[in-house]
Curated annotation (Swiss-Prot):
SUPFAM superfamilies: L domain-like. It comes from the Eukaryota. Keywords: Leucine-rich repeat, Repeat. The keyword Repeat applies. The gene is Lrrc61. LRR repeats lie at residues 54-75, 76-97, 98-119. Residues 138-178 form the LRRCT domain. This is Leucine-rich repeat-containing protein 61. It holds the Pfam family LRR_9.
Length: 259
């Protein structure tokens, strides 16, 4: 991705105010805000955002931020998305001791050294500097070895750019990366590749004739048995009703002569 420039349809540049925070969170007090989504508002100044002392989840993606100063006071912040901005540094985040997940893809971070400020964050496990699906990156990602440098700089990370680098499942991601590397290094002009062939034979996906199964037959048999039981019960009920009517008939005839 090219460094982020003017964002299409960017709203008028604005600074974060108490009124804006309250209207987007529905809270009356800034220190009551736990979750805040301020995506794509054209924010250039974080203003009073640092007063949201209990904020835990914050989305500032798609704005025009160049610094994160006020975030230094957000000690409870656990998840932060500042992707697609114009950041050249992340130093204020060094004070966010509870930060667990950071998305900084699509900014102007040029060297791994700019991530040194995150080294003291013991809780940080997820870091994204590049997002291929959203076509967001940072200049430092142009170096093919940036992954290794970031892992050495931040050994506590478990996920980088959405791929697990340690813990359960990391071996599979490493295998895929090694395979990609070998394919890239082995690519050279040579004999024409064999034309791809279908995976299955013609007609494989055609539907097969419906076959009766023992399960279906057993289900039909049980249904027929149940239906027969219902018919027997209905017959018994009809007989009982007829007998009851016959037993009551003399009484009704006698009572008709009483004045």
């Amino acid at each position: 991705m090219e460094p982020p420039g003017e964002k299409p349809g960017e709203a008028e540049a604005l600074s974060i105010t108490p009124q804006l925070l309250k209207s987007h969170s529905g809270e009356f007090a800034l220190d009551s805000i736990l979750l805040l989504k301020l995506r794509g508002l054209g924010v250039v100044d974080l203003g009073c955002l640092g007063e949201c002392l209990n904020l835990e989840w914050l989305d500032l993606s798609g704005n025009a931020l160049t610094h994160l100063g006020p975030l230094a006071s957000l000690r409870q912040l656990a998840v932060l998305n500042v992707s697609n901005n114009r950041l050249t540094g992340l130093e204020p985040l060094a004070a966010c001791e509870n930060l667990q997940s950071l998305n900084a893809a699509g900014n102007l971070l040029t060297t791994p050294g700019q991530l040194q400020c995150l080294a003291g964050l013991q809780a940080l496990e997820h870091l994204r500097l590049r997002d291929p699906l959203a076509r967001l990156s940072n200049p430092l990602c142009a170096n093919a070895s940036y992954w290794a440098v970031v892992r050495e700089l931040l050994p506590g990370l478990k996920v980088i750019d959405g791929e697990r680098v340690s813990g359960r499942g990391s071996e599979l991601y490493q295998l895929c990366r090694d395979l990609d590397s070998s394919l890239r290094s082995g690519s050279s002009p040579g004999p024409r590749a064999i034309e791809a062939q279908p995976w299955v034979e013609p007609g494989y996906w055609e539907s097969w004739p419906i076959r009766s199964s023992s399960i279906l037959e057993e289900a039909c048999r049980q249904f027929q048995d149940t239906l027969q039981e219902c018919l027997d019960l209905d017959r018994q009920a009809s007989d009982s009703l007829a007998q009851a009517q016959q037993a009551l008939s003399p009484a009704e005839t006698t009572s008709s002569f009483v004045f």
